[in-house]
C-alpha cells in the first residue's frame, strides 16, 4: 500500500490532534533513587498587556516602565477557554477528583506532586474521555504531567505493544520526558524507549523491535528508522493509540530548519487519525495550531478539546518573573556580561546565558572559564554524550552557569535557575518566551536580563508587545556596570580571555585545552 501523501498525512493527523505545549518538564535526576519534584502548582493569574513601548523608553529609564496597563474590555479575562464550557469546577483540587487511577495518584504523591495545576485540571479528564486535545499554558505549568498521566492510565488498561508516541523537538527535552515517564510509571514496570540523534541506531532499532510501551523521540531520528531500519523494526508503530506533539508550535512550523517533513514521515507510520488520539501541547499557541481545531474530522471522532490557560495574550511569561534589560555597547558586550555575572546580587545565582549561534556559545564558555566562572555549555556542536554530561553538571550545581543556544530553551525544568541572560536578543518573540521560561517556574521567582545594543531596540519592542509587559532597566543598589567596566581594568582582562579562547578554538582544542581529533559527527 502506497504511503499517504505528506499533505494528507499531516492533515489527517493534526485534525485530530490539535494542541501544543512547551511543557515544563519536571526535573528528574538520572539517579532513580533520588526522585525530584516534577511540578508544583503554578500561578496562572492573568497578565494584562501593556501599551506598545516607545524607543525613548529604551534610551531613558522611566519609573512607569515596569507597570503593566490593562487594556479596555479585559476586566474579566477568560483564563480557561473551552474548559469552562464543559463544566470544569474549582473543586477538582486533587488528581483523584480528575478520575486518575489510584496507582498513578500514589506515584505522583511519591514524587511530591499532590495538587493538579490548571492545565492538568483542564486536560486530564478530557483526554481520559478519548478526546483529541490542544493545550496551551505558560512555561513551568505542568504540561508534561497533563499528557503523560492520562497516557499511562489508558496504557495500563491495555498494555500490549507500542501504546504511545511522544515527539519533541530537542534531545534534552526528549530525555527529560523519558526520565519522567519512567519515574511516574515505576509501580507498573512500563517499558519506555528513547529514540534521539547522537547515539547508536542499531541499539535503538533493537529497542524498537522489542515492542516498548511508549516511544519518546525526536522526529529526525525516528524518521530515519522508519525509512531505513526495516518493517520488522517499526511495525509496532502501527498499533499506537496515542500520539503527543510536545512543543507543537516548533514541530509544525515551516521555513528553514522545519521539522515538518520528519513529523509527516513519523505520522505516516501510525494508524489513521480516526483510530488514535492526538494531543498537542505548547507554551505559545500560534494561530496555525489553534486553527487545527476546525479541520475536518472522522464521523466517529468527538470534537477537539482546546484549552489555553492564561494565554489570551499571545505569549505569556510567569508573573513572578522580573524582566529587565541592560544597555550595552556593541564592542564591549562580553565585558558587560562578565561584570553582570560578578555583581554581589548575581555572583551566586545559577544562571543560563542564551546565544543565537553555537560559535558564540562555544567562545563564551571558554572565555568565562578563563575569568574564573564555573561554567558549562549546551549546543549542537557538542557530541550527545558531552551534552548529557554538561546538563547533568549544571543540574547538580557543579557548574553555576550554563551557556546555551535555543536547544536549551524549550521544556527543560531546572528549578534552581534564578537568572536568565539573553546575551543575544532572540529574533522571534516566541523564542524569548521559552528562554525566560527557564526561570520563575511553578510559582518561584526569577529574573531575566536582556543585553540590548543599538541595533536591538526594535526586537525588544516586538518582544514587549508580544508578552504584554515592559522590561525595566536593570539595576542593583550600589552597582554601576558601566563604571566597573571602565574603571577596574575589566576591558583588558576580558580582552585577553577572549583572545586566548579564540586561539584555543583555532587550534582545535576542547574547553580543557586538550587537542581534539576531528571525528565524523554522528547524526
UniProtKB/Swiss-Prot annotation:
Species in which this protein is naturally found: Aspergillus clavatus (strain ATCC 1007 / CBS 513.65 / DSM 816 / NCTC 3887 / NRRL 1 / QM 1276 / 107)
Motif segment (DEAD box): 246-249
GO-annotated cellular components: cytosol; nucleolus
Lineage top rank: taxon: Eukaryota
SUPFAM superfamilies in UniProt: P-loop containing nucleoside triphosphate hydrolases
Family named by the database record: Belongs to the DEAD box helicase family. DDX49/DBP8 subfamily.
Entry keywords, A to Z: ATP-binding, Helicase, Hydrolase, Nucleotide-binding, Nucleus, Ribosome biogenesis, RNA-binding, rRNA processing
Protein name: ATP-dependent RNA helicase dbp8
Amino acid at each position: 500500500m502506497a504511503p499517504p501523501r505528506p499533505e494528507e498525512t499531516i492533515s489527517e493527523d493534526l485534525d485530530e490532534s490539535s494542541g501544543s505545549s512547551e511543557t515544563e518538564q519536571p526535573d528528574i535526576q538520572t539517579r532513580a533513587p533520588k526522585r525530584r519534584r516534577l511540578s508544583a502548582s503554578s500561578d496562572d493569574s492573568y497578565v494584562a498587556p501593556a501599551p506598545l513601548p516607545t524607543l525613548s523608553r529604551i534610551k531613558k529609564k522611566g519609573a512607569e516602565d515596569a507597570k503593566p496597563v490593562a487594556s479596555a474590555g479585559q476586566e474579566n479575562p477568560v483564563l480557561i477557554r473551552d474548559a469552562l464550557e464543559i463544566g470544569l469546577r474549582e473543586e477538582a483540587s486533587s488528581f483523584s477528583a480528575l478520575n486518575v487511577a489510584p496507582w498513578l495518584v500514589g506515584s505522583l504523591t511519591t514524587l511530591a506532586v499532590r495538587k493538579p495545576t490548571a492545565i492538568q485540571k483542564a486536560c486530564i479528564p478530557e483526554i481520559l474521555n478519548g478526546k483529541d486535545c490542544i493545550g496551551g499554558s505558560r512555561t513551568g505549568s505542568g504540561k508534561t504531567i497533563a499528557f503523560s498521566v492520562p497516557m499511562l492510565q489508558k496504557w495500563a488498561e491495555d498494555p500490549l505493544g507500542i501504546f504511545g508516541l511522544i515527539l519533541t523537538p530537542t534531545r534534552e527535552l526528549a530525555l527529560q520526558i523519558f526520565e519522567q515517564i519512567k519515574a511516574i510509571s515505576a509501580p507498573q514496570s512500563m517499558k519506555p524507549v528513547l529514540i534521539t540523534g547522537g547515539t547508536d541506531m542499531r541499539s535503538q532499532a533493537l529497542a524498537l523491535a522489542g515492542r516498548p510501551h511508549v516511544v519518546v523521540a525526536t522526529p529526525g531520528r525516528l524518521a530515519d528508522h522508519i525509512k531505513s531500519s526495516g518493517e520488522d523494526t517499526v511495525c509496532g508503530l502501527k498499533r499506537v493509540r496515542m500520539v503527543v506533539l510536545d512543543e507543537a508550535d516548533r514541530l509544525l512550523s515551516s521555513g528553514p530548519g522545519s521539522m515538518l517533513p520528519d513529523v509527516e514521515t513519523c505520522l505516516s507510520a501510525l494508524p489513521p487519525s480516526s483510530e488514535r488520539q492526538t494531543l498537542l501541547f505548547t507554551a505559545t499557541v500560534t494561530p496555525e495550531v489553534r486553527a487545527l481545531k476546525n479541520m475536518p474530522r472522522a464521523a466517529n471522532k468527538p470534537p477537539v478539546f482546546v484549552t489555553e490557560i492564561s494565554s489570551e495574550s499571545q505569549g505569556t511569561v510567569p508573573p513572578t518573573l522580573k524582566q529587565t534589560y541592560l544597555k550595552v555597547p556593541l564592542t564591549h558586550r562580553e565585558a558587560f556580561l562578565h561584570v553582570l555575572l560578578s555583581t554581589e546580587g548575581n555572583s551566586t545565582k545559577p544562571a543560563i546565558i542564551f546565544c543565537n549561534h553555537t560559535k558564540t556559545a562555544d567562545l563564551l564558555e571558554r572565555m568565562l572559564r578563563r575569568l574564573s566562572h564555573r561554567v558549562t555549555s549546551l549546543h549542537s556542536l557538542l557530541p550527545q554524550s558531552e551534552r548529557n554530561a554538561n546538563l547533568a553538571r549544571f543540574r547538580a550545581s557543579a557548574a553555576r552557569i550554563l551557556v546555551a543556544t535555543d536547544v536549551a530553551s524549550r521544556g527543560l525544568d531546572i528549578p534552581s535557575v534564578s537568572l536568565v541572560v539573553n546575551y543575544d536578543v532572540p529574533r522571534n518573540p516566541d523564542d524569548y518566551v521559552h528562554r525566560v521560561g527557564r526561570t520563575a517556574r511553578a510559582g518561584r521567582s526569577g529574573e531575566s536580563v536582556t543585553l540590548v545594543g543599538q541595533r536591538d531596540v526594535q526586537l525588544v519592542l516586538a518582544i514587549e508587545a508580544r508578552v504584554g509587559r515592559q522590561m525595566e532597566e536593570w539595576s542593583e543598589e550600589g552597582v554601576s556596570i558601566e563604571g566597573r567596566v571602565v574603571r577596574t581594568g575589566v576591558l583588558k582582562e576580558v580582552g585577553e580571555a577572549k583572545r586566548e579562547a579564540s586561539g584555543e578554538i583555532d587550534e582545535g582544542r576542547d574547553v580543557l585545552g586538550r587537542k581534539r581529533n576531528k571525528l565524523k559527527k554522528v547524526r
